[in-house]
């Protein structure tokens, strides 16, 4: 489990198509394979494949998968304190969010990405937390209003709750409940799509949070 590297600060692979999962849903099997192996060169290759596919097709599903992959890559870089590498990726991510905003079917995901963007900017410049923090909270309200049934919205809610101070509403218990809601939504209906690294990552984030809460039994259950 330690090979799964992408616990984000505020914090889808080897099939035929990079930007489309085997059964036609959104997801990159190259990115997924990178996630489970911990091979970051493969992750970057997956982003290149997605970028090439989006240049050919301009498909919203591919754009979402590309932005999601970059979201994960930025989290990885910030987690390693590689801010010089993360900074240009954050600006590219911001541009991808604005492109995604033109597709109404991805409104909830767009608003969730905007929450994450505030987090990334604070990660790059912690001194800006006093000004960006309240904006992030307001954006989180927008995201929740846009997509209470979207697991990615609940992931950003959990990331925010896990890292914000208690006086601003932060709570590890609330964050754990939000991660569990995200997992429940991933599992609803037919379950998570193939090649979806975010589902696995949410289990890891929940497990790591429970470890910090000294709930080792809960953490073991999350990892399993």
Go through each PLM region and give its residues.
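Sec-dependent N-terminal signal peptides
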Residues: 4-12
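Amphipathic alpha-helical repeat scaffolds of TPR domains
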Residues: 20-33, 56-79, 105-124, 149-165, ...
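Hydrophobic/aromatic packing residues within the alpha-helices of TPR/SEL1-like helical repeat arrays
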Residues: 43, 50, 90, 94-97, ...
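Extended amphipathic alpha-helical interaction segments
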Residues: 126-189
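Flexible helix-coil transition and linker loops at the boundaries of alpha-helical arrays
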Residues: 51-65, 96-110, 141-150, 183-196
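Boundary at the C-terminal end of the N-terminal hydrophobic targeting segment
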Residues: 14-20
């Amino acid at each position: 489990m330690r090979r799964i590297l992408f616990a984000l600060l505020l914090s889808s692979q080897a099939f035929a198509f990079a930007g489309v999962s085997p059964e036609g849903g959104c997801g990159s099997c190259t990115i997924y394979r990178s996630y489970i192996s911990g091979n970051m060169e493969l992750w970057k290759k997956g982003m290149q494949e997605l970028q090439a596919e989006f240049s050919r097709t301009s498909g919203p599903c591919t754009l979402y998968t590309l932005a999601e992959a970059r979201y994960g890559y930025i989290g990885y870089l910030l987690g390693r304190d590689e801010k010089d590498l993360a900074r240009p990726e954050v600006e590219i991510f911001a541009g991808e969010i604005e492109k995604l905003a033109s597709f109404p079917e991805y409104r909830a995901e767009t608003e969730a990405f905007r929450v994450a963007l505030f987090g990334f900017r604070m990660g790059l410049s912690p001194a800006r937390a006093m000004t960006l923090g309240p904006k992030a909270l307001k954006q989180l309200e927008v995201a929740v209003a846009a997509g209470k049934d979207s697991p990615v919205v609940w992931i950003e809610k959990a990331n925010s709750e896990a890292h914000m101070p208690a006086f601003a509403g932060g709570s590890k218990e609330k964050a754990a409940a939000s991660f569990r809601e995200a997992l429940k939504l991933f599992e609803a209906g037919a379950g998570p799509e193939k090649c979806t690294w975010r589902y696995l990552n949410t289990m890891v984030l929940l497990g790591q949070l429970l470890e910090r809460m000294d709930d080792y039994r809960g953490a073991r259950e999350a990892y399993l």
